[in-house]
Amino acid sequence: MAKKIVAVIKLALQAGKANPAPPVGPALGQHGVNIMAFCKEYNARTQDKAGFVIPVEISVFEDRSFTFITKTPPASVLITKAAGIEKGSGESSKGSVGNISKSQLEEIAKTKLPDLNCTSIESAMKVIEGTARNMGISITE
């Protein structure tokens, strides 16, 4: 029989830099999970993605064991890296703060495709394009 899931914890952590300090410690500690075991496993799994924020979904079971799934970095992080800027515009309707090419947009869409609720690369590109537009980043040919 399968183990019963007690809790699902969602966190967004720097790749390869998880430590027992907040937010990781308190979130896992209240469910009795071995915090250091999670940190070591997460850091090992994400060390090749250094510099990105990687969302993680942790399933905690009745016997206090856990499994976790890492997701792809948020689209906004990928877009700001591609555009070479710190952050998006606070007022996207008043002008752009940077731009990305169609090829960069396609690359980001391919990266995000497993986590998006679409099947084709074209629809994924439209989703990412909308995110970029809301951040004040224009798309060039």
From Swiss-Prot:
One of its GO terms (biological process) is translation. Belongs to the universal ribosomal protein uL11 family. Pfam families: Ribosomal_L11, Ribosomal_L11_N. This is Large ribosomal subunit protein uL11. It comes from the Bacteria. The gene is rplK. Signal peptide: none annotated. Transmembrane segments: none annotated. One of its GO terms (cellular component) is cytosolic large ribosomal subunit. Coiled coil: none annotated. It comes from Prochlorococcus marinus (strain MIT 9515). NCBIfam families: L11_bact. SUPFAM superfamilies: Ribosomal L11/L12e N-terminal domain (SSF54747), Ribosomal protein L11, C-terminal domain (SSF46906). Gene3D superfamilies: Ribosomal protein L11, C-terminal domain, Ribosomal protein L11/L12, N-terminal domain. Forms part of the ribosomal stalk which helps the ribosome interact with GTP-bound translation factors. Keywords: Methylation, Ribonucleoprotein, Ribosomal protein, RNA-binding, rRNA-binding. One or more lysine residues are methylated. GO terms for molecular function: large ribosomal subunit rRNA binding; structural constituent of ribosome.
